[in-house]
Amino acid sequence: MNQVLSERIKNLPASATLAMAAKARELKNEGKDIIGLSLGEPDFNTPDFIKEAAIDAIDSDYNSYTPVDGYLELKEAICEKFKRDNGLNFAPNQIVVSTGAKQSIANAVQVLINPGDDVLLVAPYWVSYSAIVILAEGNPIEIRSDIETDFKITPSQLEAAITPKTKLVMLNSPNNPSGSVYLSLIHISEPTRPSS
């Protein structure tokens, strides 16, 4: 058996983000003045209070496996933050802590999508979305937006894209990469509501 990687992985397209980052590095190494817009790397150092908290955790032997959905104290703090800053009320059992957005999105898609299900992606979208859907054996279906609509889709576009195979709509606000913000999702979500 010579094949190590699965066909599923081998058939994924290469990451556009990693390809752009490699090209930017190459040009920078050639002495060109490059502003890298590919990877979302912070342009600031980790704040001291976070570094100190990490050191304190290590010194206190706070180093065992965490609960799968996150520490209760952290989930309670997240609930408090949502209430204080956003006026949203959640219970700790409604919060899942993960290593980042990509993991959370991949987990959600894996548990929601069956082979052959359609997932609607509002384009432009984060480059990982289509690969995440393909890994779940779903079909990524693009709904295009443009500068004239501030890179937002309309309810009629969404309604036209929905078919009996549609299982999920992936829409993020603020959008990555366009930055557009849906101030209200009520009007855009109307086509997804069950008819009475």
List the model feature ranges, each with a label.
Residues 2-100, 107:
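N-terminal small-domain helix-loop-helix segment of the aminotransferase-like
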Residues 16, 46, 150, 178-182:
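Secondary-structure boundary/capping motif
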Residues 29, 59, 113-114, 163, ...:
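Short conserved AdoMet
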Residues 45, 105, 129, 178-179:
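Glycine/Thr-rich phosphate-binding loops of Rossmann-like dinucleotide-binding domains
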Residues 92-93, 110-171, 181-185:
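PLP-dependent aminotransferase-like
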Residues 173-176:
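Flexible low-complexity scaffold tracts in large eukaryotic assembly proteins
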